Amino acid sequence: LIHKTFEGLAERGRCSMGWFFGFKLHLIINDKGEILNFMFTPGNVDDREPLKQGRFLENIKGKLCADKGYIGQALFENLFLNGIQLVTKVKNNMRNSLMSIADKILLRKRALIETVNDELKNIAQIEHSRHRSFSNFIANSLSAIAAYCFFE
């Protein structure tokens, strides 16, 4: 049923938990956990793709914390030219580069990102497979994100 519902829209993707069929939700939040911007992409889209689009990063300046999936020299340089410094942990196979103490402390905020994702999944119930139409999926997702804005 889900294949017919999202035919031509959703794709098979891979995450840390394994394979899935559906969409990825990309979030930009501030240091208080407030959602500044979000974007849905098919499951097979590279995590770095939304950051290459200007509209997703509109009005974003300063430091952008991300996980290891966002590491890429071209992306880092592109963001830097737009006034955004990408801060990520170093992959195991990478040379260790010097990181300021402030950036190391900032990387601890990754737990805040995971908390936002957890609340969207478990409290706002954004993740389920009972959608019967694409418009139902969008309505459910947008209402979950709007409801998150009222969480305390």
Where are the regions a protein language model picked out?
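Hydrophobic (often cysteine-bearing) scaffold residues that line and stabilize catalytic clefts
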Residues: D47, K109, I138, L142
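Helix-centered, glycine/charged polyanion-binding patches within enzymatic domains
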Residues: K63, K68-S133
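Structural motif
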Residues: C15-G18, R130-S141
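Polybasic low-complexity intrinsically disordered regions
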Residues: L1-N92, I145
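Charged phosphate-binding loop/patch that engages nucleotide di/tri-phosphates or the phosphate backbone
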Residues: N136-E152
